[in-house]
């Protein structure tokens, strides 16, 4: 089996050893390619810290981590940046949209960086926004968008370069049920591909039906894994 993420004995703490705060405690987790995994648990249990470590935005204090078959710790800083840019897409709760760019231009930023022609990049971005129900907002500035619309722009920007691993922190938190369903349908379409994987942190029970695996977290640890609805349906049909 090919893995998107293999984490073994991962710990993350903040502060000095005598007064440190442990966010992750010797955590083990495997996520396969072709899988949509969800992390659930109470606020402060370590979910966002875990995906930040996976995304390379934080270094683990202890343990071994493989992402898409690579060990980020063995890479130079420049190599890590290039690896993330080519292979990962992530959406966190701070969207960081560029205020002077339209919705479509914000989505197209990764393509601009990759050297795409502007017209082609913006058209691709507009098509993706249309999939997320925002065809009528592609020319809007971030200040003209609601929080939920900004969230969808951030999602589209994370997906525009077809990343192998998508990492999302509460991707439906600002969305109504219909818009949230559209976002999750798109993520599920990505995850069903054998060379792609998606990790979602969520408190939204409405989206659990899209999960292949649900990892329950508490106090910096994964307490148990649960087969999601999709895996349950596959088992029933076998």
PLM feature spans:
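ABC-family P-loop ATPase nucleotide-binding domain
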Residues: 1-13, 224-238
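Intrinsically disordered, low-complexity glycine/proline-rich and charged
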Residues: 216, 223-224
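ABC family nucleotide-binding domain
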Residues: 2-218
